């Protein structure tokens, strides 16, 4: 699983890396983590075609209160299926994720204790694993509705 983290505070970067490493070991899965506090570097990963399944974003980057939300829009533009999770101390911005239309999976407060923090990150990892990685046999369906009855049939049938 490829994870990209945007966090400008070193102590929070270390917390994320440590937490992700612990979860990877517990679950026995390979998690490739890339952490940066620089928006240009972050966007470069995405523009270069690096497909990450899961993104953890701080909202307030270098004093710009909504920069993380703008970055989430950038991610959504380049990868509409990405899983985005906000990890921030700006809990008052939770409702703004709807305004920016970024479809965030979760909004994790940095100030929660380490066990709760780890559990929330783990939930995001497990969700990503089950929806994007294990569901590789996704097929196209033909769907139609007739007289109130819905029919869904795989194209290969």
Locate predicted features.
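Charged phosphotransfer/docking patches of two-component systems
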Residues: 10-17, 94
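A generic structural motif
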Residues: 24-33
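CheY-like receiver
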Residues: 52-131
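Conserved acidic carboxylate
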Residues: 7
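Non-catalytic signal-transmission and effector/linker regions of two-component phosphorelay proteins
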Residues: 1-4
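Acidic, metal-coordinating helix/loop segments flanking the phosphotransfer/catalytic sites
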Residues: 17-18, 32-54
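Alpha-helical interaction/dimerization surfaces of two-component signaling modules
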Residues: 19-23
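Conserved binding/recognition cores within well-folded domains
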Residues: 119-157
């Amino acid at each position: 699983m490829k994870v990209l983290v945007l966090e400008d505070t070193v102590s929070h970067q270390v917390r994320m890396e440590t937490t992700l490493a612990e979860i990877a070991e517990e679950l026995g899965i390979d998690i490739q983590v890339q952490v940066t506090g620089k928006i240009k570097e972050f966007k470069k990963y995405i523009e270069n075609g690096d497909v990450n399944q899961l993104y953890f974003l701080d909202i307030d980057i270098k004093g710009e209160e909504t920069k993380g939300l703008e970055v989430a829009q950038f991610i959504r533009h380049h990868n509409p299926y990405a899983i985005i999770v906000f990890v921030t101390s700006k809990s008052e911005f939770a409702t703004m994720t709807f305004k920016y239309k970024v479809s965030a999976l979760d909004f994790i407060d940095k100030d929660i204790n380490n066990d709760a923090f780890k559990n929330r990150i783990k939930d995001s990892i497990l969700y990503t694993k089950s929806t994007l990685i294990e569901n590789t046999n996704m097929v196209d369906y033909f769907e139609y509705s007739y007289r109130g009855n819905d029919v869904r049939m795989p194209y290969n049938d």
